[in-house]
Amino acid sequence: MTKTKAIDIIGAPSTFGQRKLGVDLGPTAIRYAGLISRLKQLDLDVYDKGDIKVPAVNIEKFHSEQKGLRNYDEIIDVNQKLNKEVSASIENNRFPLVLGGDHSIAVGSVSAISKHYNNLGVIWYDAHGDLNIPEESPSGNIHGMPLRILTGEGPKELLELNSNVIKPENIVLIGMRDLDKGERQFIKDHNIKTFTMSDIDKLGIKEVIENTIEYLKSRNVDGVHLSLDVDALDPLETPGTGTRVLGGLSYRESHFALELLHQSHLISSMDLVEVNPLIDSNNHTAEQAVSLVGTFFGETLL
């Protein structure tokens, strides 16, 4: 990422990939926490493209025990629209910063981005692998499947968005501490570069990020997408997210990680997902998210 590249902020207020209302308010909460002014203070050209239009939530259906893939038609609609917006951003030579919404929106964003690169790398900063397939998913929640879909396995209509699948060997998972059985097997079968919380405890976040950067460079990637799920952070510090897992990354560790990623100039696009202000405390999680994004784009104390 160059320092002069303009940024498109694109909201994707989807709540359909999981079961807790409120994550659709994530883009609003993040903007309210000062994202735009924070980035403009860094002398960046910032274009807020607003939110894509998403289907209305049918409360009765949303809370029902749906069989199979939950809210599938709505998720197709959201990701088709987001795919077009993100693709247009790249065609205009801008850096797409996508605000979720739940993590199912990464299908639309990353599939759009991958069309414009020959060998895209992906950093998945998350407590979860999001590598389930419908047949193995314990919940049917599609926010647990986007990365598997992006590698070329999953529901037909979502796969159709993805004409240039992500190679498993171009993926780095950071912050893992909750993986389903099928996800663990997929990671082992494809030898996906993975840093669990145990690895981070042993190595430290500095070495983890430096190893990530060197690994992706060795893969000769021509772009890297950063998908940052705030549930990667420990919920005792960062409570406003729907799939909390204790023992996560600290805010300080994440701050330093994003500082190192900024210095690498490797990242060409970004998602920020799973901020849910309805289960937050005084918009604290959105404020942390804004601070992390500011760090990623070059904000420093001195």
From Swiss-Prot:
Mn(2+) 2 binds at D126, H128, D229, D231. The keyword Manganese applies. It comes from the Bacteria. Its cofactor is Mn(2+). It is an enzyme of class 3 (hydrolase). Substrate binds at H128, G129, D130, L131, N132, S139, G140, N141, D180, T243, E274. Binds 2 manganese ions per subunit. Pathway: Nitrogen metabolism; urea cycle; L-ornithine and urea from L-arginine: step 1/1. Mn(2+) 1 binds at H103, D126, D130, D229. GO terms for cellular component: cytoplasm. Belongs to the arginase family. PANTHER family: ARGINASE. This is Arginase. The gene is arg.
